[in-house]
Amino acid sequence: MKPENPTIEICPGITRRTVANGETMYQMLATLASGSRMPEHSHSQEQIVHILEGKMRLIVDGVPHELSNGDSFYLASNVPHGVETLSATRVLDTFSPPRKDYLAIDEKVRQEVL
C-alpha cells in the first residue's frame, strides 16, 4: 500500500484506502466501526469481500449473510448489497474492473493536500 494513498470516509464510521490497482483489478482496505452501516447500493464491478477481522452482516439482494474472520463472499455486478457491522471490522475488497470513481477521488484528495 502506497503511503500517499489517502484514507477516505465512505459513510459514517466506514473508511477505505486503496491498496493496489491495475488494468483489470482494484483492491482496497475498508475499516468499519462497530455498529456502522453502509446503505444498500450496487455497482457494475464484480466484488470479492474478504474479512480480515471482525464480524459483519452482508445483506445481498435482501438476504443477510453473517461473515467473520477469514470469510469471503463473491458479489456479481449490479447486485444490490449493504452492510451492518456487528463488531469493529477490517475488510479487504477486490473489484474488477477497477473502481475508477474511487481512484478519481483519491487523486482529487492528493491534489488538495499539495
Regions found by a protein language model. Give the residues of each.
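Conserved short histidine dyad/triad with adjacent acidic residue
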Residues: 12, 28-42
